[in-house]
Amino acid sequence: MIIHPKVRGFICTTTHPLGCERNVLDQIAATRARGVRNDGPKKVLVIGASSGYGLASRITAAFGFGADTLGVFFEKPGSDKKAGTAGWYNSAAFDTHAKAAGLYSKSINGDAFSDEARAKVIELIKTDMGGQVDLVVYSLASPVRKLPSTGEVKRSALKPIGNTYTATAIDTNKDTIIQASIEPATEQEIEDTITVMGGQDWELWIDALDSAGVLAKGARSVAFSYIGTEITWPIYWHGALGKAKVDLDHTAQRLDARLQASGGGANVAVLKSVVTQASAAIPVMPLYISMVYKIMKEKGLHEGTIEQLDRLFRERLYREDGQPAEVDEQNRLRLDDWELRDDVQDACKALWPQVTTENLFALTDYAGYKHEFLKLFGFERKDVDYDADVDPDVKFDCIELG
């Protein structure tokens, strides 16, 4: 079929299999260009492995360190009539090219919040991966979580706390500057957001893996977070999501103490703002990212997901000098350090009040934002003919859970 982009709200409802594959190949090439090291992780589990930072960590582990990888995600496969999700095509491409490079790659498609997923992962590690993993990457970003204990469904809320938040934002459908107002979260919404996006599920994963004896001596775990800046704090760090991320920090401290007993450790890695399906859903983020991308590109500081993960692995988790990673006062790995530089943030604060519908494209990198957003779904690549026929029914070595 011939597939063109169709955007609705902050979601692109179509995806291009070949474009997604080429995106993955770009990330593999960027990783290989930095050389392969053999002093890092050997067996890696990535929970939330199909897009954004999770996919980038899987690519970095495999193609930067030669690791065997097991990826868990929840995606829709394509059929001969309908395209699947971008994450499905990303994972198919990863699997194909990892196997072609002689690397072990296995994938599980199902609800990563479920006990069934944990049981399947443990079984695979025992029967297929030599019995133990030495790195667990936790990278789930989901608006809903079904609690394994009760079957109850909880939803997260992208809302401020206390007061209605009003700020300049972009209506990404109309490319206009608007005033967006968001009502504050209720106590229940805050609690539910912590349940969905906090550290509870990460801890359940480590509990299950540890009890089953599939964590190697010295195993590490890392979960991803975002703190952002004063500009985004009301909706993010000081909002319901921020409360969930604080819970993630507390969880990391508990897990770190536990894994340190066998020479390992756990950390939250705070990453920079990037264009992902997750960030596109957060009001104010498209405008902030459009500004910060322009400023960081001008300063030669720009990084995408793969550059961030490369730096996390090579300069933090697995330093060549064997030294422990530099952490902040909360024991977090900070990869948002360049974005938070005073010169970058001062430029953002100065630019923010000047942006109007008329000068949006001139003052910010909104054109770059739109391009990156469509690229997430496999579009806007110069090396893909979007008027050519493409088969949406892509199959690969993937275990489907109920």
UniProtKB/Swiss-Prot annotation:
GO terms for molecular function: enoyl-[acyl-carrier-protein] reductase (NADH) activity; NAD binding; trans-2-enoyl-CoA reductase (NADH) activity. Gene3D superfamilies: NAD(P)-binding Rossmann-like Domain (3.40.50.720). Transmembrane segments: none annotated. Its EC number is 1.3.1.9. NAD(+) binds at residues 48-53, 74-75, 111-112, 140-141, 245, 274-276. NCBIfam families: EnoyACPredFabV, PRK13656.1. Monomer. This is Enoyl-[acyl-carrier-protein] reductase [NADH]. It comes from Xanthomonas campestris pv. campestris (strain ATCC 33913 / DSM 3586 / NCPPB 528 / LMG 568 / P 25). The lineage of its organism: Bacteria, Pseudomonadati, Pseudomonadota, Gammaproteobacteria, Lysobacterales.
